[in-house]
Amino acid sequence: MTTLGVLMMAYGTPRSLDEVEAYYTDIRRGRKPSPAELADLVRRYEAIGGVSPLREITERQAKAVEHVLNAQGETAFRVYLGMKHTEPRIADAVADMRRDGIERAIALVLAPHYSAMSVGTYHEQAREAARDGGPKLYCVNQWHLEPRFLDALASRVEEALRLCKSPEQAMVIFTAHSLPARILDMGDPYVDQLRESGEAVAKRLGLAHYTFGWQSAGRTQEPWLGPDLLEILESLAKEGYREVVVCSQGFVADHLEVLYDIDIEAKQRAEELGLKLVRTRQMNDDPDFVRAVADVIERAKRDAGW
């Protein structure tokens, strides 16, 4: 039986505080952070326990998806994990596939919504690595409307609302990682796709109160997409809301932007404003999410004609 490769790609995270500077430098395309910038990032990692669980979670996700795919028995799958900013790199994963004799592979980023500035850059790295010697790649651009993914999102929003005293009056905020605002002039689908998935969840649950916002914007001179989550919290407090549910629909695992930006920074601001903030559980390697990702890969296999 021929084995079909799966190139599963994720952002990556430092394994210890000693790796933070190299990680940050890689994100900044070789420009080292200033001492103040580095100290601030280290402080945030220390606040969540010294290291992000993202690497371990991503590895568990990859193993679980491979298990579900191979349980079908029709095709043999092998999942290879490639990170954008840490080891193992995307190019390393492609080289491993080539070494193992993989001729075809589905390439999937663990981010449901497409942007040329995010998912698109992963695919560029993968295609470049596979250009000489393969394997042949079929890249999945987006999967934000995958039915099982939407079901998983909806169940987590519903679960979070049950923790509110007055769930019918709570505001649900669908957030995602902000990107430079210039994507709006590029015809980039990122904003529209985030609205599509959020609206789909709201429709499933019959939500009366929901809105969209951004978080974790980069600290650069150019403008980023807004409004920011902290700004939204201030507006909602002025409007008389007392409970909010934050659904970080653009993320599929616990990491710094969830554990610090929401669980510490946003919750602290909410408390100052007299708001109760409930954050939806992340997908991590929960079976419903794993099955959703497996569905995406199986559909991609059919679409590729493999």
Residue positions per predicted region:
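Active-site-proximal alpha-helix that buttresses catalytic centers in soluble enzyme cores
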Residues: 1-306
